């Protein structure tokens, strides 16, 4: 349903209320609220897809769209690329002699809670979320989800900000709780080809690894393929970051 259509529906409903003097019920307001929320959630994607907006959206992939992805197939792929190399980490003077210098903090931050409706070039509002304690983070997980697929690529401005502060960034590979096990099975069935493409995407967009959020119940074979995929990725790119969460 397109945004303009939604607006027309709302206008027609309100006109009927005014003309006939019908007192709206609670269910009416619930329906109206749902329509408005749908419009707000999808308006950026719809406008971009319709060619009525020039606002590009951050990349996300299913296993099929990942395997068929090429930078040349996406005219807007440049807008999500990081242009800032990972800076050397600056270590200040010791404040606490008892602090462990080997301690690490991986921040799983809800960077863009609506990745599918987020401008890949940053936001136009001062109320946008800005992460402000890079000095404490050893690594940063671009924690987000997408209706367009399980692989969510960090938008360039977050990677640039992290790299400026010497913090590497991971994209998210998300298999949700209670999800369909066939999604994971398909993802890792040809795990070498998928892993090669994940690495290609990572290198093109300029981030530093992936965080696997694996909450979907799978069988022994699929679990083994997941493990083999990660081992293969480490073999191909020994310095890439890989995080794992399993519930």
What are the residue ranges of the model-derived segments?
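A generic local structural motif
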Residues: 4, 16-17, 126-128
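Sec-dependent N-terminal signal peptides of Gram-positive bacterial secreted proteins and lipoproteins
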Residues: 8-26
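Chitinase-like catalytic core of GlcNAc-active glycosidases
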Residues: 98-247
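Sec-dependent signal peptide cleavage junction
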Residues: 20-41
């Amino acid at each position: 349903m397109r945004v303009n259509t939604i607006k027309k529906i709302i206008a027609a409903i309100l006109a009927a209320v005014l003309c006939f003097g019908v007192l709206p019920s609670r269910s009416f307001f619930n329906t109206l609220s749902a329509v408005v929320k749908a419009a707000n959630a999808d308006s950026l994607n719809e406008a971009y897809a319709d060619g009525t907006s020039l606002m590009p959206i951050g990349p996300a992939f299913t296993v099929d769209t990942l395997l068929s992805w090429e930078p040349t197939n996406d005219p807007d792929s440049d807008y999500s690329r990081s242009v800032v190399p990972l800076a050397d980490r600056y270590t200040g003077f010791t404040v606490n002699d008892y602090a462990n210098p080997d301690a690490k903090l991986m921040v799983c931050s809800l960077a863009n809670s609506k990745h599918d409706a987020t401008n890949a070039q940053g936001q136009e509002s001062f109320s946008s979320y800005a992460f402000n304690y890079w000095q404490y983070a050893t690594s940063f997980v671009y924690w987000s989800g997408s209706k367009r697929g399980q692989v969510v690529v960090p938008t360039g401005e977050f990677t640039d900000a992290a790299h400026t502060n010497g913090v590497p960034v991971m994209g998210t590979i998300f298999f949700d709780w209670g999800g369909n096990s066939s999604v994971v099975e398909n993802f890792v069935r040809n795990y070498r080809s998928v892993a090669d493409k994940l690495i290609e995407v990572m290198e093109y967009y300029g981030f530093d690894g992936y965080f696997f959020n694996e909450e979907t119940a799978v069988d022994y074979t699929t679990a083994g393929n997941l493990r083999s995929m990660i081992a293969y990725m480490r073999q191909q790119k020994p310095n890439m970051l890989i995080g794992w969460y399993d519930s």
